[in-house]
Amino acid sequence: MPYQVNRRQLLQQLTVLSVMSALPATALAQIVSNAAPRSRFDSNSTAEDVTQGLDLRGQTIAITGANSGLGYETMRVLTMRGAHVVGIARTQAKAEKACSSVRGETTPLFLDLAKWDSVVICATRIRRLVTHLDGLICNAGVMAIPELQLVNGVERQFAINHLGHFILM
């Protein structure tokens, strides 16, 4: 079956595309920003500000990399809003330390995203611990590994940041 092109629609779309590409970047940004509603949040907003009024009681959310940085802050604020957080770190000790330092319901688990058997074990533990999972925040990762390292036949950073989380899901 041959593919048919509606020339009139094609010309209309190409005209819009050519006009958009001819606009200066500032004009295009103005059009896009005017189309989107303005948020009341800005660079001074805190996680508490953004989640104010959010009731997460009864929700279970797992977070990888929950022992530091954005993962830890996410766990802290989600538990503050009533969620049960499964805090996942590379070692059980790190997970326990992070989970015990926040107020609210947490469950510490460990997971090494570079070791796929560890990922499967962690996923199995999550399934045994909770009846349902409302969210998974794939926060853990590595960056700027100085030299090429292979894990399971693929580059380490790709294995940890992408494939490990894919297997976990």
Predicted segments — roles?
Residues 2-18:
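N-terminal secretory signal peptides and thylakoid transit peptides that target proteins
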Residues 1-6, 30-33, 140:
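N-terminal secretory signal peptides
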Residues 17, 24-25, 133:
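Short, polar/charged, Gly/Pro-enriched helix-capping and turn/loop motifs at alpha-helix termini
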